[in-house]
Amino acid sequence: MKRRWKKFLAGVLSAALALNLAAPLALAGSSTIGAACSVTSVFLYPEYVGRVDGENVSCIQGEVSYDHGLLTFHGDVTLTTVGVADLGTVPLVKALSEKNLRLVANGKVTGRTKGNGIEEAKEIAGGEYDLTYADLGAYLDTKPNGILGGDTGTTITAGTEITLKDFHTGIGGGDVRINGTVNITGAMFEGATYGIANFTTMNPGSELEIHADRYIRKDCLLTYNGGHLLMIVAENGDGNNIVQGRLSIGNDVSRFWYRTDENGAYTEINMKENYENFTAAIGQNQDYLELTDVDPDQPESE
C-alpha cells in the first residue's frame, strides 16, 4: 500500500513539475498577463528558460532560446508574421514586462512583418538583422517602425548590423543609442517616411545610413558624437530635408568632415573655427549629406 501511495505521489509531483515548466510559454490566444516579451505569436514569461517555438512552424524557423531576459538567436533564424503565418500587425519581437530585454544573435536574423520590427528592447547585441515591412497596402495606416526604442532607451551595440527596409519610420519611440551599424531604406510610396522620429545618438565607430523622404522628423533629434553618417533622399522625396535644428553635433566632437555630393570634396569643420559653414549647409535642402570623424584623406591602414 505504501509503495502504491509513493508511486501516486511521484506521478502527481511529476505532472505538477511538467505543468510548471510549460506555463511560462504561451501561444497567441492564451492569457498574456505578466508576459516578459513576445516573439511573433509566442509569449514568454519571466521565469521561462528554454527553446522558443512558434504555434505555426512558419513563424519561427531556426533556433531561438530565452533565459530570464536574454533572447538568443542561434545561427540563421527567420521570423515572419505574414503569409501563411499571418498574425496581423504583430511585431517580430516586443519587450513587455521585461524592461531589460537583451537580444543576442550569432548569425543572421531575417524578419518580415505587417507591424513593427523590434519594440522596446533594452539592447540589441551582435549579429545581423535584416527586417522588412511587408504590407504595402496598409503602409500609411499602420505607420510601422523598424525599431521602436524603449522607455528607458535602447542600445545597438558595436558589431551589430541592422537593415530596415520599407518601414514608415526607421527608428522611433524612446531614445536609441547606435554603437553598431544601421541601414534604413525608406519605403517607396506616397506619404512621408522618416529615417529618425525620436532622439537617437550616434557614437564613435558607429554607422548610420538613411534613405528616406525625410531624414529626421520635426521636433526630433539626431545627435552626432562620431562615426559615419550618410543621408540620401528617397526617389519620391518631396525636397524638404532641412536638418538644421534636427541634427546636433555632440559636445565632445572637436572636428569632423562633411560633404553634400557623393563625388564632391569633403570640408573639414573645426568646431571652434568654422562651424558656421556647416550650419549654413544644413540650413538648406540637401539630397545628399555625409559626415565622418575620420580624415577622408588619411590613407587606409593595411
Regions found by a protein language model. Name each.
Residues 11, 29-302:
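A composition-driven surface/loop motif
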Residues 1-12, 21-30:
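Bacterial Sec-dependent N-terminal signal peptides
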